[in-house]
Amino acid sequence: MRILVTGGAGYIGSHTCVELLNAGYDVVVVDNLYNASEKALERVEEITGKKVVFYNADIRDKEAMNDIFDKEKVDAVIHFAGLKAVGESVVKPIEYYENNIAGTLNLCDAMRNHGVKNIIFSSSATVYGDPAFIPITEECPKGTCTNPYGWTKWMLEQILTDLHTSDPEWNVILLRYFNPIGAHKSGMIGEDPKGIPNNLLPYVAQVAIGKLECLGVFGDDYDTPDGTGVRYYIHVVDLAVGHVKALKKLEEKPEVRVYNLGTGHGYSVLDVVHAFEKACGHEVKYQIKPRRAGDIAMCYCDPTKAKEELGWEAQYGIEEMCQDSWRWQSQNPDGYATEK
């Protein structure tokens, strides 16, 4: 099978390309490199010993997308491309709706024009908003999103569901998850955020390597074991494998399927800090700060459905997530700008 991966040069996309190539799939990547590096794909090829077909293109470019589908006879699409920073989405809602919604509509139009009706969508557990219950199952009410990023994911899930309703040949899988962390065991590919990291682990890693001075921990008075917020994290390689497992599910009768991908339990902010200290061998400085508005005490998912229907289960715990992140960060202190 030939798989088109949008956003395939990004953090999750590049790791998914490795797993796809290792599983014997042919891979075509479309990425505008806004928050990614072509070097990631060069390293994907080095890791796997296989070639990736790469197009530096924006999914919002209708002509470019139709040209790519003309040239590459793909069987399915794994869709990662889009803006993804929660905080930035609050400041730049128009950019997020235009990029994520319009871009995906354009992608789906090109797919329809070329008879490609298999899509795995990289959604997010942000669609659950402040969850009605924990652990979160796929039946947890959604649509109470707290930021424009979450709303784009919610809207795109609805759009893809409507596509299947209008044409039952559309085969759609929606994968929901939070907080991918870690890196490939080789240390050759990993998360390379531009500027100050938005997410916890890249920030911790940059404090550990000395690029940033101190981690701010927002709140230590939550109703959790150590008072800091509890979230669920997933190793990016586990997440990539989940997307490959989902491809096999697309071979069954077309419908809309939804799966949570996670470890099934959460880790507090200080759990992550202490695990990273163990991985890097020295202290990670942090400072307790006031709670942030909108933050919730605890959030993690129940991945039972993915285990039962996809045969997928997370293999890595927080220790390995931190070890692999540290290997990537220490070998590549400036990300893909680091000369190898």
Enumerate the language-model features and the residues they cover.
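N-terminal Rossmann-like NAD(P)+-binding domain of SDR-like oxidoreductases, especially those catalyzing
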Residues: 1-183
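Catalytic core of nucleotidyl cyclases, primarily class III adenylyl/guanylyl cyclases
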Residues: 186-188
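Short-chain dehydrogenase/reductase
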Residues: 97, 146-154, 190-198, 202, ...
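Residue-level detector of secondary-structure boundary/capping sites
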Residues: 24, 150-151, 195, 263, ...
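C-terminal substrate-binding subdomain of Rossmann-fold SDR/epimerase-dehydratase oxidoreductases
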Residues: 200-340
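Short, basic/glycine-rich phosphate-binding loops at helix/coil junctions
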Residues: 182-184, 221-222
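Pocket-edge positions in alpha/beta enzyme catalytic cores
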Residues: 57, 69, 96, 192-196, ...
